[in-house]
Amino acid sequence: MTEAVAAEATETAPATDDRRGGRRGERGDRGQGRGDRGGRGGRDGGREAEKSQFVERVVTINRVAKVVKGGRRFSFTALVVVGDGNGMVGVGYGKAKEVPAAIAKGVEEAKKSFFRVPRVGSTIPHRVQGEAAAGVVLLRPASAGTGVIAGGPVRAVLECVGIHDILSKSLGSSNAINIVHATVAALKQLEEPASVAARRGLPLDEVAPAALVRALQNQKAGV
């Protein structure tokens, strides 16, 4: 009688182990399934791809206060420049209770104000001067290899545009907001040499210098 009971226990033990092993295997399979879903990384992939398309520069962040009956309420403002590095740029100004939220608002506003900047190679077609309030900025074309000769606010705008060789000088206010808007005003004055020649009814070589004409030809040829 005792031997029969022992034999039955021996036969049922592997079945119990198999059931436990099966449950563990199912749990492992579920864990793999969760890993395949990718979690939050999969959902945020689109946002990261969108960010990589643009060049963002935070020019300045200020803390401002509003005086109310109960005291002062503090918030932050952010001046942001956004561009694609290929001739498109915009400037935005965001305000929020936290710095990241203010920057995000500035980025969204900058994307809504995009405009195209004419370029010749890695510089600008001609000299321009922009003004905004007390800010005055002078931009001059430069030969290849010169680099961006500019201060912080002006440099931020030019880098977002994708200009790599240029000379600049700030002649007015040192306020970063005025300088950025003066730089944008200067860039909006730029014109394509071909459109200037067509408006005047003259050939391109009579409107633009020989070096500029060669640069335009090389740009069309993809050199």
From Swiss-Prot:
State any GO BP term from the record. translation
Q: Which Gene3D superfamilies match?
A: 3.30.160.20, 3.30.230.10
Residues of the region (Disordered) are: 1-51
Q: By its UniProt entry, which SUPFAM superfamilies does this protein fall under? A: dsRNA-binding domain-like (SSF54768), Ribosomal protein S5 domain 2-like (SSF54211)
Q: Which GO terms describe its cellular component?
A: small ribosomal subunit
Spans of biased composition, class Low complexity? 1-15
Q: How does it assemble?
A: Part of the 30S ribosomal subunit. Contacts proteins S4 and S8.
Q: Which family does the record assign?
A: Belongs to the universal ribosomal protein uS5 family.
What name does the UniProt record give this protein? Small ribosomal subunit protein uS5
- Which species does this protein come from? Paenarthrobacter aurescens (strain TC1)
UniProt lists the gene as rpsE
